Regions:
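Short secondary-structure boundary elements
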Residues: 1-127
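Conserved small-residue-rich
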Residues: 137, 143-144, 156-177, 182-185, ...
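Tandem amphipathic alpha-helical repeat scaffolds
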Residues: 40, 80-84, 97-101, 116-131, ...
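Start-of-helix signal in alpha-solenoid helical-repeat scaffolds, especially tetratricopeptide repeats
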Residues: 30, 34, 51, 55, ...
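Charged, low-complexity surface patches
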Residues: 2, 180, 192, 220, ...
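Flexible helix-coil transition and linker loops at the boundaries of alpha-helical arrays
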Residues: 63-71, 85-88, 128-135, 139-160, ...
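Tetratricopeptide repeat
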Residues: 78, 97-98, 135, 139-146, ...
């Protein structure tokens, strides 16, 4: 009865071309077709209620995450809804996930993403791929805004370290070594301040990759030593294996 009334109401709206179903979704989802109707509905809802609704919708999208490359389609929704909800740190987390996807570190020595991952074929994806420099500037501005608005909270510090790692890797990969190293050294410093051993290890590894690229075997040896000690302290067996392979490489360079 109540569900039936809702369904009948939706059918009336659909028959009058006010809404349409969103295809290829596991649940039944409708979207508003007419822009003026969207604007009217927005005007009827207070700003506070809009924020609550956007936060609720973001939560629904998060439940659909599969922790696979296909999640990139959901990251754009999550970034938008968290931004509209005023949850800047959550927005930033998904913006950085989008950035990581499009930087696609498949050419790195030990890639995070497979080059076989398929880029989604949509307008947003094509825009980012063809305007990467502009997108990087947007992300940089976003980080300044988040730090200015939210202050130095643990969540903001974690976001900042993630950002420094991504940007450092990117700049080193494209040969802008000065920028890249500056970001990675800043990452190591910040991670040490908050005793975040995972980010410290990420920073050390990135400096090792940089030293391989420029042939600096002595500095590489030093970073390998501190990285191996840290990985041993943390019982990170997989990381130990990677670092020992790199140590072997260092010995024959």
């Amino acid at each position: 009865p109540e569900h039936l009334q809702v369904f009948q109401g939706l059918e009336v709206l659909r028959n009058n071309n006010f809404i349409r179903p969103v295809p290829q979704q596991p649940e039944v989802i409708y979207e508003i077709v007419q822009q003026k109707l969207k604007e009217y509905i927005h005007q009827q809802i207070s700003l506070e209620k809009q924020k609550i609704l956007h936060s609720y919708i973001a939560g629904l999208w998060e439940k659909r995450l599969t922790h696979s490359p296909q999640d990139i389609r959901l990251y754009h929704h999550l970034e938008y809804h968290y931004q509209e909800a005023g949850e800047l740190v959550n927005m930033g987390r998904y913006k950085l996930k989008i950035l990581m996807y499009y930087l696609n570190f498949s050419n790195e020595l030990f890639p995070v993403l497979s080059s076989a991952d398929i880029m989604p074929d949509d307008d947003k994806s094509r825009y980012i791929e063809s305007n990467l420099g502009k997108f990087l500037a947007e992300v940089d501005e976003m980080m300044h805004t988040i730090k200015r608005t939210c202050g130095e909270t643990p969540e903001v510090r974690d976001l900042e370290m993630n950002y420094l790692h991504l940007m450092g890797r990117h700049y080193i990969r494209v040969g802008e070594y000065e920028k890249g190293v500056r970001n990675i050294l800043s990452l190591i410093e910040q991670a040490a301040e908050v005793h975040n051993r995972d980010y410290m290890l990420m920073g050390y590894k990135q400096m090792i990759y940089y030293d391989i690229q420029i042939g600096n075997t002595e500095e590489m040896k030093n970073y390998l030593e501190v990285a191996l000690n840290l990985a041993d302290e943390c019982n990170y067996h997989k990381e130990m294996g990677i670092l020992l392979r790199l140590k072997g490489l260092n010995m024959i360079m």
